Amino acid sequence: MSVHIGAKTGEIAERILLPGDPLRAKYIAETFLEGAVCYNEVRGMLGFTGTYKGERISVQGTGMGVPSISIYVNELIQSYGVKTLIRVGTCGAIQPDVRVRDVILAMSASTDSNMNRLIFRGRDYAPTADFHLLRTAYEVGVEKGLALKVGNVFTADMFYNDEPNWETWARYGVLAVEMETAALYTLAAKFGCRALSVLTVSDHILTGEETTAEERQMTFNEMIEVALEAAIRNGA
């Protein structure tokens, strides 16, 4: 056991999907995994291990934001030996050519979080996805005929921000806003692991367009399939 995860040694697979919502973790386990067993209920942050196409896979809720995902990624890697981590979640688009229901593969992540400034003593660090996971996820998405975008996302430290300045980030090519990827990529790099964020565009920040619950669920399923295929095709 670790501080925030109640699993025993060996109960978590080396490949894991990371939704923010623990109920999404339960949904993924029940919908996509065979023989799924719950290994964690600490703080209501559900975690499950099962198989997908015969390959062992885990799924763990992380909560929202850099501090929360950092806790789970640190413990999954250091206490349980996880090697491949794929975030699956939603984001808000800030580019006119990115539409709701599109799937974004986050090649890199800008951020206003001070996490990396603290780690690197005031200097900037460029959190980046694992190339092999990114390439495989892109190939799977193309095979499925999905509306894919690949590029930089912005990891925000605040959900409610009175002065977000999205126009500047958009001018520099950032595709969308979310709250976890920069931390995931930084920690994966620190420990020599592989990481990727696969994100569904749930709303458009500039236009105000939003998806319905049904639309989000349909696109979410496609996103999960991309993430699962990327995980098993790249081994541990």
From Swiss-Prot:
Positions that bind phosphate: G20, R24, R43, R87, V88, G89, T90
SUPFAM superfamilies: Purine and uridine phosphorylases
Group of enzyme by EC: transferase
Keyword hit for Transferase: yes
Ligand binding (a purine D-ribonucleoside): H4, E178, M179, E180, S202, D203
Site entry (Important for catalytic activity), positions: R216
Any one GO molecular function term: purine-nucleoside phosphorylase activity
GO CC, any one term: cytosol
Transmembrane segments: none
Active site, renumbered: D203 (proton donor)
Catalytic activity of the protein: a purine D-ribonucleoside + phosphate = a purine nucleobase + alpha-D-ribose 1-phosphate; a purine 2'-deoxy-D-ribonucleoside + phosphate = a purine nucleobase + 2-deoxy-alpha-D-ribose 1-phosphate
Source superkingdom: Bacteria
A Gene Ontology BP annotation from the UniProt entry: purine nucleoside catabolic process
EC number(s) recorded for this UniProt protein: 2.4.2.1
Keyword terms, alphabetized: Glycosyltransferase, Transferase
Reported function: Catalyzes the reversible phosphorolytic breakdown of the N-glycosidic bond in the beta-(deoxy)ribonucleoside molecules, with the formation of the corresponding free purine bases and pentose-1-phosphate.
Subunit comment: Homohexamer; trimer of homodimers.
Family stated for the protein in its record: Belongs to the PNP/UDP phosphorylase family.
Listed name of the protein: Purine nucleoside phosphorylase DeoD-type
Species of the source: Geobacillus kaustophilus (strain HTA426)
Organismal lineage: Bacteria, Bacillati, Bacillota, Bacilli, Bacillales
